[in-house]
Each structure stands twice: as C-alpha cells, then as structure tokens.
Amino acid sequence: MSNSLLVCHGLRKIYREAQLETEVLKGVSFAIEPNELVAIVGSSGSGKSTLLHLLGALDEPSDGDVFFKGQKLNSMSANKQAKIRNQEIGFVYQFHHLLADFSAMENVAMPLLIGGMATDKAESKAKSILDMVGLSHRYEHRPSELSGGERQRVAFARALVNNPSIVLADEPTGNLDHKTALEIYDLMCKLNKESGTAFLVVTHDNELAAKLDRCMHMQDGNLVQVEVA
C-alpha cells in the first residue's frame, strides 16, 4: 500500500442544506497503483463524480483521508493542493472546456505558460503531445474547427502536457458517439503505455470500462464491487 499512487480511506461526503443531510459517499476505500488504468462505473447520482472531486482535491471530504504519493492530500494547504493539481494530476471532463479563441496548440500550451515556461518551449512541447494523440495536422485549428473526438483528444493532450502521475477523467466520452468513444478509450490505453501515466475514469458505460485494467462499481455512495479486467 505504501507504494500506491493514490489511496483513500473511509471517504464520506455529506451535503447539508437547512435541516436536510444527503450522504453522497458512505466510507469509500481503495488504492490506485502507478501506471494503472482504472474505471469507476455507476449510474448518475451514485457518487462517482463526487469521489473524483475529492481525489483531485477539488472538494474536501466530510470524513476520511486521501493520500497522494504517501502525503495526506486533504490536510494540505490550498496552495500545496493547487501545486499538486497543477504538476501531478491531469483533469478531463465530459465537456472539453477548451478556450474557443485559441488554437489546439495554444490550448495545450496554456498550462505550461501559466507555469512560467517560455513560449517557444511551451509550444514545442504542446506540439509533441498533440503528435502523441494523433493531431499533428490540427496544431492551428480552433475548437470550432475540430470534431467532437478531436476536441477530446486536445483535452487529453492538455491534461498530459505537465507529465502528470495520474489523469482523472469524468465521463470523458459522454458527449461522443460510440465509435468515437471507443477510439478515445483506445487512446487512453495507448497513452498509458507510452507515458506511464495512470488513469482513473468515471463512466456509466460498462463496455468501455472493460477495456481498462480494473473496474470498480459504485452504487448509492458505496464501492460495492471490484473486478479485474
């Protein structure tokens, strides 16, 4: 367990509004190893996305702990959490969240520029990552000029540009047709082998989840089943 990349123990999340309490996560515990491809499958409202937010330090648990490379993530300062998110964790969402007025290359380079990298170096690295995701012919295209699958490829490139240890992907193929979704999952497997980056993917699609190393099922805030692919 000490060599695990990401570990959570007894994670609970309770939302309170007036006199109403809603327990979304009910004591979730598991570990992700370096370079592992893991899926979390469950229906809408089962707690999958909430869990991902806690693991990425985008929200605080009501109880329990998250450890990243042996460090307790949820007890760190906001600045330390932000540093780990920027340098160690990539994020991909159902909607690509690309900047409409910028090219694919500029969107991918943006995290590097924000981190202080020189423009020429940032653009060179962005191009190399776009090459990796099969978009060497789309450097200068804006999001409106790309297909849905190409936009998600750019989103994955942006998530990978800082060489993160893990990418957290929340329904990354939810807006795509089945054929394109399969291509995106094949891309994740390819990137995992080439870069060594671990992936934790939230999805409701069992067929797509089966393409990864391990599949965990969530139901009503509980991790109820673990399967090895």
UniProtKB/Swiss-Prot annotation:
Cell compartment(s), UniProt:
Cell inner membrane
Which terms under GO biological process does the entry name? lipoprotein localization to outer membrane; protein localization to outer membrane
Instruction: For this UniProt record, give its keywords in alphabetical order, as a comma-separated list.
Output: ATP-binding, Cell inner membrane, Cell membrane, Membrane, Nucleotide-binding, Translocase, Transport
Residue limits of the ABC transporter domain?
9-228
Q: What is the E.C. number?
A: 7.6.2.-
Task: Output the PROSITE patterns linked to this UniProt entry.
Answer: ABC_TRANSPORTER_1, ABC_TRANSPORTER_2, LOLD
User: Which cellular component terms (GO) are annotated to the entry?
Assistant: plasma membrane
Main localization is: membrane
Is Membrane included in the keywords of this UniProt record? yes
Q: How does it sit in the membrane?
A: Peripheral membrane protein
Which residues are involved in binding ATP?
A: G42, S43, S44, G45, S46, G47, K48, S49
**One family name in Pfam for this protein:** ABC_tran
Q: Which CDD domains match?
A: ABC_MJ0796_LolCDE_FtsE
Alphabetized GO MF terms: ATP binding; ATP hydrolysis activity; transmembrane transporter activity
SUPFAM superfamilies in UniProt: P-loop containing nucleoside triphosphate hydrolases
Respond yes or no to whether keyword Transport is given for this record: yes
InterPro entries from the entry? AAA+_ATPase, ABC_transporter-like_ATP-bd, ABC_transporter-like_CS, ABC_transpr_LolD-like, LolD_lipo_ATP-bd, MacB-like_ATP-bd, P-loop_NTPase
According to the lineage, what is the superkingdom?
Bacteria
- Listed NCBIfam families: LolD_lipo_ex
Subunit field text: The complex is composed of two ATP-binding proteins (LolD) and two transmembrane proteins (LolC and LolE).
Function comment: Part of the ABC transporter complex LolCDE involved in the translocation of mature outer membrane-directed lipoproteins, from the inner membrane to the periplasmic chaperone, LolA. Responsible for the formation of the LolA-lipoprotein complex in an ATP-dependent manner.
The entry's family comment says:
Belongs to the ABC transporter superfamily. Lipoprotein translocase (TC 3.A.1.125) family.
UniProt protein name: Lipoprotein-releasing system ATP-binding protein LolD
Q: Which organism is it from?
A: Photobacterium profundum (strain SS9)
What gene makes this protein? lolD
